[in-house]
Structures are given as C-alpha cells and as structure tokens.
A protein has these predicted regions:
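A generic structural signal for short, non-catalytic loop/turn and secondary-structure boundary residues
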Residues: 2, 27, 46-48, 62-64, ...
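C-terminal terminal-subdomain/extension
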Residues: 55-105
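Intrinsically disordered, low-complexity peptide-like regions
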Residues: 3, 17, 34, 39, ...
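Short coil-to-beta transition motif at edge beta-strands of beta-rich domains
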Residues: 1-12
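Compact nucleic-acid interaction/catalytic patches
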Residues: 9, 15-19, 24-57
C-alpha cells in the first residue's frame, strides 16, 4: 500500500460499522492511517462540507460514483480490516495535488 491508494476497509464505530473506501495516508507494521471516502455530500451540514474534498477523477480512481475525501479526521485502522489484496485504485496526480493544496488551506 502506498500513499493515495484507495482500498476497501471495514470501518467500525460504536457497536456498528461498514465496508467503505478509504484513502491511504500512511502504513505502519500493523495499522494504516486513512481518510474515509464518501459519496454522501448533500445531506451534510455546510460546516462538514467545507472539510470534504471532491475527487474530480473518481472513475479513474476506481470509484463507482462521485465521491469525497472526508478530511475532517484521520482514522487509524488495523491492517486486518483492510482488503489489501484488492486495491480499488488510487487518486490521479491532478487530484493528489489538489488534495494537498486543500489540506494546506
């Protein structure tokens, strides 16, 4: 796994969780730091939307619909929760550069 790769991971919260696409930021021996990727935008508050980065090249990234990187929080996941054998894809170079600028704002 490398930075800006996209994988499916089981992301848990409280007593639940679901499989979702995640953007790899960093990998260690037993965990990875990621941003969640979501297609849910319209239902979010204006405040939350300001932290959502639109993936312009979502098809090239291997996603099946317009999606957003949730830069609100990073999530640290155990590597066992990530389907590392089957990466979805990765951000294009253009989206990588845009994301870095977005985060630096």
């Amino acid at each position: 796994m490398t930075v800006f790769d996209i994988y499916i991971a089981f992301v848990s919260w409280g007593s639940g969780g679901k499989n979702r696409p995640v953007l790899i930021l960093e990998e260690s021996a037993d965990s990875a730091t990621v941003f969640n990727i979501t297609s849910q935008y319209e239902s979010k508050s204006d405040e939350i939307r300001t932290k959502y980065f639109v993936i312009n090249d979502w098809r090239q990234a291997g996603l099946d619909r317009l999606s957003y990187v949730d830069t609100n929080n990073t999530v640290t996941l155990p590597l066992t929760s990530i389907d590392r054998k089957n990466p979805i894809g990765r951000l294009t170079a253009a989206d990588e550069m845009r994301l870095l600028k977005f985060i630096d704002q």
